[in-house]
Amino acid sequence: MDHLEVYHQFEVSKPVSLQPHLNLLAKGLIGAEWLVAGSGLGATNHFEAGGFMRSRAGVEWPDVQIHFLPVALSYDGTTVAETRTGHSLQMHVGYNRSPSRGFVRASAPLPPVTSNGAGDLMTAPPPPPPVVRFNYMSDEEDWRGFRAAVRIAREIVAQPAFDGLIGPEVTPGAAAHTDAELDQFLVEHLESAYHPCGTCRMGAARDKMAVVDGGGRVHGVDGLRVVDASVFPTIPNGNLNAPTIMLAEKMADHILGRALPPDHAQAAATWIDPEWRTRQRERPPVRKQWDGEF
């Protein structure tokens, strides 16, 4: 129903972050350059580096997403990390395993994920507001996955490519290493990535939880379709914008009666580590920050 994420923040040793440009004058200059020339800091969305990875051996598809932002601040921009250098960065770290079905398979069955949300719609007049219960982090697998994601993020910034750039860790802080310490950090800092979806899921008419069919038509209702992220039957293990655009284009073809050409009949090939059942990576990192199991 939604993705959670946590901000892993660091001080930066070189003047390469956005932190000095957050005042009103700097924002105005950035905006003016973009309006006039289409260049400068205003011409980027600033999430230009990121990646998907598997949290452990036995997971076939990536279940961890990390992307970098060149300043450490809260989602609404009101709180900026205090650093000695005046520069910072943060990694947006998410464990994006789709609950109960879909994108992750393992050689041995994973424990069932029970962090499934629910919503209530009442019809009594006047209808009260809908009730949505996201039920975040109600399964131990979610805690394990987020701990692994934070430790992987630490491994990334510990590599030689970041030498001379990354300073002290701001959050969760160098002292947070045990499961209990990381869990406390997660309790205090996890927040929504604002990726709600799946409340109007696609499926066969015999599926009691399905609302629409493969063409977006609402079961049992004539002349009504739903074409948005709510019809995803499972949560994609990444951001929703690209899948939603793909869904809308496909549904538009259905509505217009267009048939896909033959060369689109098969999905693009994807690479999967042939040894995914027994290893999490091809080789160990140059510097390893964690000696235990992810």
Positions of the model-derived regions?
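Mid-to-C-terminal "cap/lid" subdomains and adjacent gly/pro-rich loops that border
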Residues: M1-R84, E155-A161, A180, Q184-C197, ...
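Structured core elements
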Residues: Y7-Q9, F52, R105, D120, ...
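Intrinsically disordered, low-complexity regions
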Residues: L29, S39-A43, G51-F52, T78, ...
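Glycine-rich, aromatic-lined ligand/substrate-binding cores of catalytic
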Residues: A43-V132, Y136-P160
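C-terminal lid/capping helical subdomain adjacent to the catalytic/cofactor pocket in oxidative enzymes
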Residues: S100, L110-S115, P125-F294
